[in-house]
Amino acid sequence: MPGRTFGGVVVTNYLHRPLLEDLVAAVAPGGVLIYETFAEGNETLGGRVTNPDFLLRHGELLDLVRGHLRVVAYEDVVLGEPKPAAVQRICAESVSEWRSEHVQHRP
């Protein structure tokens, strides 16, 4: 993935911290990152994900994109439905202008 960029990067219910900076770098100029996964506090709600290695720390997604992407929306919430869960969600966009030369075309 290093060196490749995409107009959209979407991650749900997955956290592998060594990849986080690469995910931000993979957002093409004018592109968007949408990320949602479990957060600290989930372990107290009876959720399956309880290992701190797989739970976002408070504000971790905000820290990740700071200085790289513009935050469009962010939540650090406890959901009640369908099952109680602590999650963080972020939608952030590249502030660079989108241009067609940034699109990768595959043969």
PLM region descriptions:
Residues D76-P107:
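Core SAM-dependent methyltransferase catalytic element
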Residues Y14-A28:
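A short, conserved alpha-helix within the catalytic core of class I
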Residues V10-T12:
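Redox-cofactor binding/interface segments in oxidoreductases and associated redox assembly factors
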Residues M1-G8:
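A short acidic, Gly/Pro-enriched loop at the edge of an enzyme's catalytic core
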Residues G3, H16-L20, L55-H58:
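Structural motif corresponding to alpha-helix initiation and N-cap regions
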Residues L20-D22, T44-L45, K83, E101-H102:
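Short glycine-/acidic-enriched loop or helix-start segments at secondary-structure transitions
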Residues G30-E43:
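Conserved beta-strand signature within the Rossmann-like core of class I S-adenosyl-L-methionine
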Residues P52-H68, V72-A73:
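Short alpha-helix
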